């Protein structure tokens, strides 16, 4: 289904910090939100 928003944004720096440990990556195509597929 759709990627899950991880509650972290990555607009300023395109890197997810704390949610990266949860398997989340920066989806720069959708307002810079960290998402997990």
From Swiss-Prot:
Keywords: Disulfide bond, Knottin, Plant defense
Disulfide links within the chain: 6-24, 10-26, 16-34
Record-linked SUPFAM superfamilies: Cyclotides
Cross-link annotation Cyclopeptide (Gly-Asn), location: 1-37
Any Gene Ontology biological process: defense response
Record InterPro entries: Cyclotide, Cyclotide_sf
Pfam families assigned to the protein according to its UniProt record, in alphabetical order: Cyclotide (PF03784)
Coiled-coil zones: none
Entry comment on modification after translation: This is a cyclic peptide.
Family to which this protein belongs: Belongs to the cyclotide family.
Free-text note on domains in this protein's UniProt record: The presence of a 'disulfide through disulfide knot' structurally defines this protein as a knottin.
Function: Probably participates in a plant defense mechanism. Inhibits the cytopathic effects of the human immunodeficiency virus.
Record's protein name: Palicourein
């Amino acid at each position: 289904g759709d990627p899950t928003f991880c509650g972290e944004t990555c607009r300023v720096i395109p890197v997810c910090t704390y949610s990266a440990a949860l398997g989340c990556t920066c989806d720069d195509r959708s307002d810079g939100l960290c998402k997990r597929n």
